[in-house]
Amino acid sequence: MTASPDYLVVLFGITAGATGAKLGSDEKELILLFWKVVDLANKKVGQLHEVLVRPDQLELTEDCKEETKIDVESLSSASQLDQALRQFNQSVSNELNIGVGTSFCLCTDGQLHVRQILHPEASKKNVLLPECFYSFFDLRKEFKKCCPGSPDIDKLDVATMTEYLNFEKSSSVSRYGASQVEDMGNIILAMISEPYNHRFSDPERVNYKFESGTCSKMELIDDNTVVRARGLPWQSSDQDIARFFKGLNIAKGGAALCLNAQGRRNGEALVRFVSEEHRDLALQRHKHHMGTRYIEVYKATGEDFLKIAGGTSNEVAQFLSKENQVIVRMRGLPFTATAEEVVAFFGQHCPITGGKEGILFVTYPDGRPTGDAFVLFACEEYAQNALRKHKDLLGKRYIELFRSTAAEVQQVLNRFSSAPLIPLPTPPIIPVLPQQFVPPTNVRDCIRLRGLPYAATIEDILDFLGEFATDIRTHGVHMVLNHQGRPSGDAFIQMKSADRAFMAAQKCHKKNMKDRYVEVFQCSAEEMNFVLMGGTLNRNGLSPPPCKLPCLSPPSYTFPAPAAVIPTEAAIYQPSVILNPRALQPSTAYYPAGTQLFMNYTAYYPSPPGSPNSLGYFPTAANLSGVPPQPGTVVRMQGLAYNTGVKEILNFFQGYQYATEDGLIHTNDQARTLPKEWVCI
């Protein structure tokens, strides 16, 4: 409980758009502000004041023109928001003759005028609101306390309260907004008089700033307090999210940025509010703008929030125990980097809080560094100085720097410490002829995208294809990973027809996605299989992979029938020659081939449910046998000199029966730098 203020200042705002329950939901700007002072001690009301506010966009809806009788010409000469607020502050100060011990508080009809209009607009325009706008009385809630028998709060408005008290509607003022302020003044006088004797003692509060913090996985979170924000700029921080929801109270540590499988932000965040009321107001900001981007806002659950922000790591809790710190994430550190080197990297202009204690290195479960770290700074100035070092060198590597959040720290540590991003294969044997997805066909109804940004998502690809996105077969978008489990910059897409695939390749080739141009090639499922096995595909045609080159041996030798499985020792042979990649199982996990597989692509990124996903990359058993198509045996030579030629290799095998020079396959091992040769003998 707090002491009752001496005065209430009744405040009513009008925007250039919707009124009533939809006020502020259309992101329209404030154009008119009314206020009136109510003396609670002497039970008197002051004069009605108003000020026109010039919006940046001089456009009024028809409903607004009809309600307010305001035209664009009158607004063009009005005061801007900061000037109007100074005029309001000066007027209230003069009327109340504010001195030592004099107090006043705003009073509004509901939450929208302060939370959905003034705070969001002032934040966007970088206008500093006076302190009085951070607390206010909601007349509807106060009326419900005063008159418990009145209608529910969501059904209350000025007209309903006036009717409940048997007041006649104010006839002295007929203008919209002015009449509401007149009636609100009369309602307040009735509430503080007999028989109600109501005291205004517990105002609503607006948070000054967002507080970061940790969240335990054991914490119970109300499902009705969480939203999912989608479409965020990738560089946005929790402070940017708090600014987008300015006026609404976010719980401590309640802004959690979501990361994708590669540990990068995916443009989504989960936000937890202090109450269901604030969550509902947040949903009204659906498709409001953050800069030039509109943000989608949807309901989410407490479980969703805990999956992202929850954690129990003592190391993280200790690191985040220092409050009011700005967190910066470092990415691309040398694996041998030490805390002393990180401290020296930032230097004296941006000292790290606590020195080495303010650095948290991210490691895998076995203790190996990931190249990521989080650093604490005591203030915004130090953090900004630190971010200016983005892409500066530490050793021989450039370091990427981003603003971060407590939830992101927890999420990254959970991701790397619990299990590898790419689980390692454990079976002691490798299937030779696993099941295949779809038989390869010569119909060129597929397209290949090459040069995608590494952070590209399924949604980015659909936006990139534009009108052709509707021609994608159900579950036909596949993003390919490299042998490290990271995006390769390639994707394969199965279209509904060869004609549409041709048109997509023609119109989208070298079209930009973000800051990169993307190459688009038409191909068939069979050509796709060739590419995934090591071949190349471009606009000049197809070059077959090594395993499809001729492999000749004396016809007199018959090769034994292959077994269903082979021991792991067979990994010394090129897998594209002797075995198929393991078939993908229906799951959302990543499926790498083992480190012994030397393929162009050893795994792919499965499309999420509802996205296009049934095209197989791997050839069927009919087109890829478990052994070379001709009788013979393949051996691998490792450690050759870089200038070794075919003649030297054949001389080396002198005395053995080997194939012709056509049976010599040149290869490069992706995991090593040593040259190798494959010889059919």
Swiss-Prot record:
Residues where Omega-N-methylarginine is found: 582
GO molecular-function term, one example from the UniProt record: mRNA binding
Gene3D superfamilies according to UniProt: 3.30.70.330, Ribonuclease H-like superfamily/Ribonuclease H
Signal peptide feature range: none
Stretches of the chain forming a coiled coil according to its record: none
Biological process (GO), any one: regulation of inner ear auditory receptor cell fate specification
InterPro entries given in the database record: ESRP, ESRP1_RRM1, Nucleotide-bd_a/b_plait_sf, RBD_domain_sf, RNaseH-like_sf, RNaseH_sf, RRM_dom
Expressing tissues: Epithelial cell-specific.
Effect on the protein upon substituting residue 259 to V: In DFNB109; hypomorphic mutation affecting alternative splicing in patient-derived induced pluripotent stem cells and other cell-based assays
Subcellular localization(s) per the UniProt record: Nucleus
Chief subcellular location: nucleus
Function field: mRNA splicing factor that regulates the formation of epithelial cell-specific isoforms. Specifically regulates the expression of FGFR2-IIIb, an epithelial cell-specific isoform of FGFR2. Also regulates the splicing of CD44, CTNND1, ENAH, 3 transcripts that undergo changes in splicing during the epithelial-to-mesenchymal transition (EMT). Acts by directly binding specific sequences in mRNAs. Binds the GU-rich sequence motifs in the ISE/ISS-3, a cis-element regulatory region present in the mRNA of FGFR2.
Disease cited in the entry: Deafness, autosomal recessive, 109: A form of non-syndromic, sensorineural deafness characterized by bilateral, congenital, severe to profound hearing loss. Sensorineural deafness results from damage to the neural receptors of the inner ear, the nerve pathways to the brain, or the area of the brain that receives sound information. DFNB109 affected individuals additionally exhibit vestibular dysplasia, although they do not manifest problems with balance or movement.
This protein's name: Epithelial splicing regulatory protein 1
Gene coding for it: ESRP1
